[in-house]
């Protein structure tokens, strides 16, 4: 399994008690995180979070199987994608905005996407009305929940045009027809 593959380098971690440890694979990183460890150096915190995100994505991808039917074969990351995607993908930076987003049906309604820059068939940037932008990347396709229908695993990176805020999230999305809206099967 991918979680136990050695990265070829070590990430130094520590916890508030002063205890330190080095990890070099997803399995050890995940265990250390659950035990309260974080990046030993403040400037490596972003890398620590990115590694956790990537490890979880690999773990979720490992659950994919061959699908019998697909309603995402013609999926395009374009201006319409946010209109068919749940508000769970919205750019949320506070508990208050999270509560508001939950009441809205689509990502587009939550973030008011103003423009889209398509980088490739599997990657696009979405710019919202408040100076935020999200990069969506389709990383895998397959049957996630054993219903025979093809699902997609995506990664979402949130950033702001002026400032230093950033966050990363992963999702498994599905839909039951070519025109149907997507639903979230898993989120991390």
Model-derived segments and their meaning:
Residues 1-142, 155-188:
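Beta-propeller-forming repeat regions
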Residues 147, 151:
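Acidic carboxylate motifs that coordinate Ca2+ or other divalent cations, activating on Asp/Glu
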């Amino acid at each position: 399994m991918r979680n136990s593959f050695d990265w070829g380098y070590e990430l130094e971690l520590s916890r508030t008690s002063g205890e330190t440890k080095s990890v070099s694979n997803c399995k050890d990183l995940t265990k250390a995180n659950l035990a309260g460890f974080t990046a030993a150096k403040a400037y490596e915190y972003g890398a620590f979070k990115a590694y956790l995100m990537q490890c979880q994505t690999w773990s979720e991808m490992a659950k994919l199987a061959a699908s019998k039917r697909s309603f995402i074969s013609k999926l395009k990351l374009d201006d319409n994608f946010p209109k068919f995607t749940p508000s769970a993908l919205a750019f949320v930076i506070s508990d208050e905005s999270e509560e508001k987003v939950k009441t809205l049906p689509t990502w587009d309604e939550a973030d008011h996407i103003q423009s889209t820059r398509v980088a490739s068939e599997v990657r696009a940037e979405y710019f919202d009305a408040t100076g935020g932008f999200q990069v969506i990347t389709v990383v895998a396709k397959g049957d996630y929940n054993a219903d025979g229908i093809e699902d997609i695993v995506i990664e979402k990176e949130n950033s702001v045009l002026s400032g230093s805020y950033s966050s990363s999230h992963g999702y498994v999305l599905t839909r039951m027809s070519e025109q149907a809206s997507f639903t979230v099967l898993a989120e991390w």
